[in-house]
């Protein structure tokens, strides 16, 4: 609590636009400030800077309420390319499931895809906050690469996703499964892996039958 208060407080050496920053921080809930404080290892100044960056980003078309009401995001969601599953994984984490064959880089609108991604992460985290103490704090992402071809390879979106992991949702995604990536995915992964840095360790490439181990025994997710 003290760290959150320090983040909200104005500093004597603050620049002239500090009042704008203070107004932004005043609009942020305590849980958000506390999360960035933990991410920055209790360094209030670094956490404050990262939180302000996050809040400014939210103002650029990624506001939670704005995404919920967006007809464009709803149209993108209707494609079924990415969904928040109704079931959790074996660790009770929410799961965002992406079917790559439903995503064509030639016809997609990047902004819509990015905004759908954020909306699904928001929905997962909102679920967890509603469950109170003892609930998981992270989610899993599953990318189903069965049938993947190069027309499904979207490096620009991947760069956005990685930026989200680092800057906007740090330590919120604790597992990424790549389901049966074909050989044509290899050069894509060679580009993506270095961009992920330490987060590359979260990624596991698995067969569909082995992915079942990450879910409850009764799950039928990978039976098809």
Please state what every model-predicted region is.
Residues 1-224:
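Basic, amphipathic alpha-helical/coil surface patches used to engage anionic, phosphate-bearing ligands
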